[in-house]
Amino acid sequence: MRFCVFGFLSLFLIVSPASAWFFPNSTAVPPSLRNTTRVFWDAFSNFTGCHHGQNVDGLYRIKKYFQRFGYIPETFSGNFTDDFDDILKAAVELYQTNFNLNVTGELDALTIQHIVIPRCGNPDVVNGTSLMHGGRRKTFEVNFSRTHLHAVKRYTLFPGEPRWPRNRRDLTYAFDPKNPLTEEVKSVFSRAFGRWSDVTALNFTLSESFSTSDITIGFYTGDHGDGEPFDGVLGTLAHAFSPPSGKFHLDADENWVVSGDLDSFLSVTAAVDLESVAVHEIGHLLGLGHSSVEESIMYPTITTGKRKVDLTNDDVEGIQYLYGANPNFNGTTSPPSTTKHQRDTGGFSAAWRIDGSSRSTIVSLLLSTVGLVLWFLP
């Protein structure tokens, strides 16, 4: 028996072993995924208006959020209560300062709206010192009875200013072999590395050896063994460790868009631009911390439906402080050249997943959308 497929294909799903969803552009994201919620984080909206002195059911969850990103030290690892206490008030004030919000110490609407935005999993505060303010030698000290609010907007570095040693300016990177990525996906990372090498004295080369590469990249779900578990769709998107660790992990549960077509992307609330996240996390791999400059690549959050890949002066100054300037850098950043093959997605939109498991609902949606007509011929 011959099996023939005839139909007008508008969408096509490719399923392969490993773990992540990729879409070539935002129009390939099915309607059912365009308004996916952030699950646990969206519930934080219930705390809008909470302030010091109140006891609100479930408020301990937002304390855990702040602890995850460093605003509450690990020393407060006991059972959190639902009291809006001094510890939470100090955390809220520091968060508001870091993100240039009105410092009220309350969970006002703007603060909650910002908290639920998808973000990098790296902390903003380490050992009581904010990484988002103060530049390379000025720190932003946190006292949990009083928050010092003086700060200077500037790029920041990890504590101790770790960086790749001078004899390692040609770095290799490799993908976890458990993630059989397509060339289109790999090219996204190549472009992201190129944005940093364009401005500084570093070179990046793709390697086939995951075990010996300087930088290792993988897509994982949930608890994947590094103490920084992922949380499903949206929420924390990725994290990377400071030099010379080289570990770069992305959440495989996200809906990753490989080619950012900004106009149509704006209406997609559950898809994330892969290159935008990759450029940010590479900054961490090279030694940059989070910046309070909202336009910078190293700003911790990125809204869905947004593409943000161009380095700002803040990013360039930070990376050149660590490694010096690329002698060919002319003072401006521009997108890497793109081949025609990378620009064109053909006459149809494709989505592919690297995972042995599959989202049956997505498969059925795709099949119903494409208008397939199946003919079985003897």
From Swiss-Prot:
Pfam families: Peptidase_M10, PG_binding_1. InterPro entries: M10A_MMP, MetalloPept_cat_dom_sf, Pept_M10_metallopeptidase, Pept_M10A, Pept_M10A_Zn_BS, Peptidase_Metallo, Peptidoglycan-bd-like, PGBD-like_sf. PROSITE patterns: CYSTEINE_SWITCH, ZINC_PROTEASE. Mostly expressed in roots, and, to a lower extent, in flowers, leaves and stems. Repressed by acetohydroxamic acid (AHA). It comes from the Eukaryota. This is Metalloendoproteinase 2-MMP. It comes from Arabidopsis thaliana (Mouse-ear cress).
